[in-house]
A protein has these predicted regions:
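N-terminal secretory signal peptides that target proteins for export/translocation
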Residues: 1-6
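Bacterial N-terminal signal peptides
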Residues: 8-20
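Stable alpha-helical elements in mature extracytoplasmic
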Residues: 32, 40, 66, 73, ...
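Electrostatic cytochrome c docking/interface patches
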Residues: 22-40, 53-58, 108-134
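The feature marks the first
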Residues: 31-79
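Sequence context surrounding c-type heme c attachment/ligation sites in exported
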Residues: 37-45, 64-67, 71, 130-142, ...
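The canonical Cys-X-X-Cys-His
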Residues: 43-50, 102, 138-147, 200
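Axial heme c-ligation environment in periplasmic c-type cytochrome domains
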Residues: 55-61, 76-118, 153-158, 176-208
Length: 208
């Protein structure tokens, strides 16, 4: 092998070695659900229950929610991009690693189904969720949240099984400007009336 070739091979091997070393911290920083559970049991349990299940209807169900989405919301509570005095106080004490650990804990729980309660709203809720309202430029909710309400990690939350009261409160908050950390949702909610919001909220909680 010529000297120049040996030098080139050596540089390639050195580069590959550097890549491996650079990847090690990322692996070490992987979220730890056990640490998340420890934080949850001391900080989150009062409002969200031990496993993030069906607690008070005013508070969201966290079990089975996408980890990336939960981290985004915690980060935005901490930064003041999403307003809630209680959650800002809780999130402010969390590091980025803490948030990832807590999110991994809740995301690892099995999401449980909910049940729609108002049959009178079923048709209207399904119509908007699956087809939107073209005359008012309202897109189908299923386009972002999925046909079964499973959502898209980081961007759009799981809605299936969520408290109807919580969903209704968030849609109203988007509509009136109390919540503004999602431009798409602000635009959609602004076009929904009270009956449509109630119908959607009740419908999506029963999605499977």
């Amino acid at each position: 092998m010529k000297p120049a070739a040996r030098v080139s091979v050596g540089l390639v091997l050195a580069f590959l070695g550097a890549c491996v070393l650079a990847a090690e911290p990322a692996a070490a920083a992987r979220a730890d659900p056990a640490k998340g559970e420890a934080i949850s049991s001391g900080t989150c349990v009062a409002c969200h229950t031990n496993d993030g299940s069906r607690g008070v209807a005013a508070n969201p169900i966290l079990q089975g929610q996408h980890a990336d989405y939960l981290v985004k919301q915690l980060s935005e509570f901490k930064a003041g991009k999403r307003e809630n005095a209680i959650m800002k106080g809780m999130a402010s004490a969390l590091s980025e690693a803490d948030m990832k650990n807590v999110a991994a804990f809740y995301a690892g729980k099995q999401a449980k189904p909910g049940f729609a309660k108002n049959k009178d709203f079923a048709t209207l809720g399904e119509k908007i969720y699956r087809g939107g309202a073209a005359d008012r430029a309202i897109p189908a909710c299923a386009g972002c949240h999925g046909p079964n309400g499973a959502g898209i990690p980081a961007q759009y939350p799981r809605l299936a099984g969520q408290h109807a009261d919580y969903i209704e409160a968030q849609l109203v908050a988007f509509r009136v400007g109390l919540r503004h950390n999602s431009e798409p949702m602000t635009g959609v909610a602004a076009k929904l009336n009270d009956r449509e919001i109630k119908a959607l909220s009740d419908y999506v909680t029963g999605l499977r």
